[in-house]
Amino acid sequence: MTTHLQLEAEIGGYEAATRAQEQIDVTYAALAQLVGGRSDEVALFDNSTHAWNAAFYSIPLGPGDRILTGRDEYGSNVLAYLQVAQRSGAEIVVVPNDGDGQIDLSALTKLVDERTKLIGLTWVPTSGGLVNPAAAVGRIARDAGALYLLDATQAVGQFPVDVNDVGCDLLTGTGRKFLRGPRGTGFLWVRDTALERLDPFVAEIRSATWDGGRGFTWADGARRFETWENSYVNIIGLGAAVQQALELGLDAIGDRTRTLGERLREDLGRLPGVTTHDLGTHRCAIVTAKIAGRSADDAAAALGRASINVSTTVAEHNPLDTEERGIHPLVRFSPHYYNTEAEIDRTVAAVAELASAAGRP
């Protein structure tokens, strides 16, 4: 990335982008390989929310149409559903979770009908280690003939993703989380057979071509969802991050992160004054916990001073889950493949000290 920035400074942005075209093409190809699709099915964005919006706002919806979604849907997605429902008269139906805390497949099957135009699901929520049964939802969507939009922001780079196994029509992701890429990067994958059912909500010189008069033609494939101006240095960095993940192997990454996550979750759960709050029959490396006598922000700051980087859950990021469980905010741990067992042990010891100190007069 620094090499490209220097090249832009030396010869100019247009010229540097032209020289970097091969690297840019590699990014599309790497992302396609990452999710099991084709390069022409990939569109690039500056974040995953813009990628998700480009997909969602391209779905024609009208009065009486139904959007089915889960209780763990990301907050920005929920806001978009609400806005479009107000504009179009479409109906939002929130599918309940089952006893394990994941989307209830039986309830989803019963709620799907001929009015269902979209099933939108967040695969891994920002609020915990739950891994929703995305492939099972895909089978239900396919049988119903509904479009299936999968938010894989917390999934890509953490474990294997295959759009054909999952059965989604649209999938969105980011570069900055488990892919370990630069901030300001996101992508959309669109199944080619879904294109005819979508109407991109922005037409501009990257996404369409003027035919003369009053006509225009959409660009081929997923490029019709892109905009002309891009940060090519970020695109190059994203490609490098994806290539590294592919070289390491997503199966190996998934096994490693899951093992570390389960170890951390189990060890934290044994500590007096600490409760973990991750749901689902399948869980990933995201671990959430509450420390008695400590606010999440205070605990995160204290751990940060010990060079243990964590974050906190924010109610607005998962409003339906917050409403359901009423336990936010929580401390969120996200171990990755490069972390060691010794670092897990040090983290548990630091949390134990925080919990113990909170209980002392």
Which residues does each predicted region cover?
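Pyridoxal 5′-phosphate
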Residues: M1-P361
